Swiss-Prot record:
SUPFAM superfamilies to which the protein is assigned, alphabetical: Cyclin-like
Top-rank taxon: Eukaryota
Post-translation changes: ADP-ribosylation on serine residues by PARP1 in response to DNA damage disrupts the phase separation activity of CCNT1, thereby preventing activation of CDK9.
Xref: Pfam families: Cyclin_N (PF00134), CycT2-like_C (PF21797)
Location of cross-link Glycyl lysine isopeptide (Lys-Gly) (interchain with G-Cter in SUMO2): 342, 415, 480
Annotated motif Nuclear localization signal, positions: 253-270
Descriptive protein name: Cyclin-T1
Organism this protein belongs to: Mus musculus (Mouse)
Keywords: Acetylation, ADP-ribosylation, Cell cycle, Cell division, Coiled coil, Cyclin, Isopeptide bond, Nucleus, Phosphoprotein, Transcription, Transcription regulation, Ubl conjugation
Record carries keyword Ligase: no
Length: 724
């Protein structure tokens, strides 16, 4: 397999004789004309790529496709301006930046015919262009043998300049020359990418009067890149590169207005040979073309800000290996200004423009960096053109602030709606039956996505008031809870018993103040046949299991307490034993135990941001099972056989449960009730004591006797377990 791959790689590298005998040459196109056609096609690919907003990597890949294609096909058979859009269309897909066929055709038309209007997409000419481009793409694929993975010299330039800790200017110049070699020469058809990278670095060093020192191992820097490279080969290819640059018309030199090179125009004159003077002047002329900035911006794809003036060329060619002036810099100083490339370790396949520089051949870097590091001389500080994350965030601060304000407004609206609805419910007339609809968490709920955007912990809660009649049936995914208001007849059965128990619980609470906080988390809010979607703090995979209606009472209460208390676990409420006493006790006991105090004090509840340390898993909290078991005899005296949910099938949830549930919901939404008595019940208490006959008759359909609702003075005592 490896040998096959090597043979395939060698297939696309040609000797000078093969280049002189190319298909275009056989059809009568001379060498200079063929090179000019290649440069024009590369020029069009660069222009189109910038307009299509694809990466420089994609443009470079398309240029290599073009060079290889015309080693098999002739320019006389396939026009360069027809083939270039197809090559770019294919390269964009290979490099994972696909563009629409329509966009590619329109951009090609704009580049080739800037004065003409865009073709109508329904016209015959446009449809013919579409068909031609698709056919050409197929021809390119077949001509290339579907070998679409391209290794570029830029990757090796980056690795080598890192290895030798080159300065920012040298790294930028070398990278720039690598792009130049693709646009203007046929080096990509003659030499492997490491060799081309060495030529580009050597040319940059020679022109910039920089020298990369010999390592402590006695090796030259290019030996770490490619062992086959010699100084003679580098000098020969550098001379060839400069000759091509001299012949190339200025209109094809798409390297313009680069400040680093323009600054080189101000270098001091130096004694040198006439041929080298001509060569240097060629580079300077090539670079200092005054034309549009947009072309070089796309070609470079890197920061060119604040590059210092570059020294002149050395006086002789031999001096390129014996100069003493060395300017070294940390390898990281220039990385931020490079157009990043990404390569795989094995085959150099890049799927995006960014190069994971961390993953670049660390073994090579470890071998060479220590050797070159010992030769490092005085460093020259070059200002970095890096754009930091802070600067980027500052640039987009206004946009982020606007989005944040919008989200906060949405969240505040949802919270205010819940608070308003809860206060209406708590202060409502006793003769209205209140229906709470809480949707089970499901993907079919059409109102859920909006709530997720505003506050993902939002519970959907509707509080319509029915006028004594039976409420409209709820949706399949919603659960109804009818809060019944019962008559005063049942509340006198166990007055003394509940008062005594209330006092005992207060005494217990005084003796166990340390257990109050976590004990309340498990026993403050228990709703045995209510299913709540978990909030963001307590969202666990086990919640659907715990909240199923047929589960045991222990699972039900444990799930609900973990769901509700995890978001409000730092608040302090009434005594724990009293917080659960009225939940499953006889209604008469509840009525009496809550009659003694009409005010319901609620301390401020913490918001979600004040609870960073509280886990949604309540398994670590103390669960006072023994104290719950002491309540079992009272349960057996007052209750009938338990139903599927832990109480009688026809028994309704008490009013106290609703109060506790609503305050849990408010705390989960971050709404803080006032320290003063939050709800005043005195004005309507007389109506609870003397319910009207109409309210009783409206509830005659149930088997329970009407009872007045318990008016909460403190949270209910702990919940006893279900009798076996």
């Amino acid at each position: 397999m490896e040998g096959e791959r090597k043979n395939n790689n060698k297939r696309w590298y040609f000797t000078r004789e093969q280049l002189e005998n190319s298909p275009s040459r056989r059809f009568g196109v001379d060498s200079d004309k063929e090179l000019s056609y290649r440069q024009q096609a590369a020029n069009l690919l660069q222009d189109m790529g910038q307009r299509l907003n694809v990466s420089q990597l994609t443009i470079n890949t398309a240029i290599v496709y073009m060079h290889r294609f015309y080693m098999i096909q002739s320019f006389t058979q396939f026009h360069r301006y027809s083939m270039a859009p197809a090559a770019l269309f294919l390269a964009a897909k290979v490099e994972e930046q696909p563009k629409k066929l329509e966009h590619v055709i329109k951009v090609a038309h704009t580049c080739l015919h800037p004065q003409e209007s865009l073709p109508d997409t329904r016209s015959e000419a446009y449809l013919q262009q579409v068909q031609d481009l698709v056919i050409l793409e197929s021809i390119i694929l077949q001509t290339l043998g579907f070998e679409l993975t391209i290794d570029h010299p830029h990757t090796h330039v980056v690795k080598c300049t890192q290895l030798v800790r080159a300065s920012k200017d040298l790294a930028q110049t070398s990278y720039f020359m690598a792009t130049n070699s693709l646009h203007l020469t046929t080096f990509s058809l003659q030499y492997t990418p490491p060799v081309v990278a060495c030529v580009c670095i050597h040319l940059a060093c020679k022109w910039s009067n920089w020298e990369i020192p010999v390592s402590t191992d006695g090796k030259h820097w290019w030996e770490y890149v490619d062992a086959t490279v010699t100084l003679e080969l580098l000098d020969e290819l550098t001379h060839e590169f400069l000759q091509i640059l001299e012949k190339t018309p200025s209109r094809l030199k798409r390297i313009r207005n680069w400040r680093a090179y323009q600054a080189a125009m101000k270098t001091k004159p130096d004694d040198r040979g006439a041929d080298e003077n001509t060569s240097e002047q060629t580079i300077l002329n090539m670079i200092s073309q005054t034309s549009s900035d947009t072309t070089i911006a796309g070609l470079m794809s890197m920061s060119t800000a604040s590059t210092s003036a570059v020294p002149s060329l050395p006086s002789s060619e031999e001096s390129s290996s014996s100069l003493t002036s060395v300017d070294m810099l940390q390898g990281e100083r220039w990385l931020s200004s490079q157009p990043p490339f990404k390569l795989e370790a094995a085959q150099g396949h890049r799927t995006s423009e960014s190069l994971a520089l961390i993953g670049v051949d660390h073994s090579l870097q470890q071998d060479g960096s220590s050797a070159f590091g010992s030769q490092k001389q005085a460093s020259k500080s070059v200002p970095s053109a890096k754009v930091s994350l802070k600067e980027y965030r500052a640039k987009h601060a206004e946009e982020l602030a606007a989005q944040k304000r919008q989200l906060e407004n949405m969240e505040a609206n949802v919270k205010s709606q819940y608070a308003y609805a809860a206060q209406n419910l708590l202060s409502h007339d006793s003769h209205s039956s209140v229906i709470l609809k809480m949707p089970i968490e499901s993907s079919e709920n059409p109102e859920r996505p909006f709530l997720d955007k505003a506050d993902k912990s939002a519970l959907k809660m509707r509080l319509p008031v029915a006028s004594g009649d039976k409420a409209v049936s709820s949706k399949p995914e919603e659960i109804k809870m009818r809060i019944k208001v019962h008559s005063a007849g049942d509340k006198h059965n166990s007055i003394e018993d509940s008062v005594t128990k209330s006092r005992e619980h207060k005494e217990k609470q005084r003796t166990h103040p340390s257990n109050h906080h976590h004990h309340h988390n498990h026993h403050s809010h228990r709703h045995s046949h209510l299913q709540l979607p978990a909030g963001p703090v307590s969202k666990r995979p086990s919640d659907p299991k715990h909240s199923s209606q047929t589960s045991t009472l222990a699972h039900k209460t444990y799930s609900l307490s973990s769901t509700l208390s995890s978001s409000s676990s730092t608040r302090k409420r009434g005594p724990p034993e009293e917080t659960g006493a009225a939940v499953f006790d006889h209604p008469a006991k509840i009525a009496k135990s809550t009659k003694s105090s009409l005010n319901f004090p609620f301390p401020p509840l913490p918001t979600m941001t004040q609870l960073p340390g509280h886990s949604s898993d309540t398994s670590g909290l103390p669960f006072s099972q023994p104290s719950c078991k002491t309540r079992v005899p009272h349960m057996k005296l007052d209750k009938g056989p338990p139903g599927a949910n832990g109480h009688n099938a026809t028994q309704s949830i008490d009013y106290q449960d609703t109060v506790n549930m609503l305050h849990s919901l408010l705390s989960a939404q971050g709404v803080q009730p006032t320290q003063a008595p939050a709800f005043e019940f005195v004005h309507s208490y007389g109506e609870y004591m003397n319910p009207r006959a109409g309210a009783i008759s409206s509830r005659s359909g149930t088997t329970d006797k009407p009872r007045p609702p318990p008016l909460p003075s403190e949270p209910p005592p702990p919940l006893p377990p279900l009798p076996k």
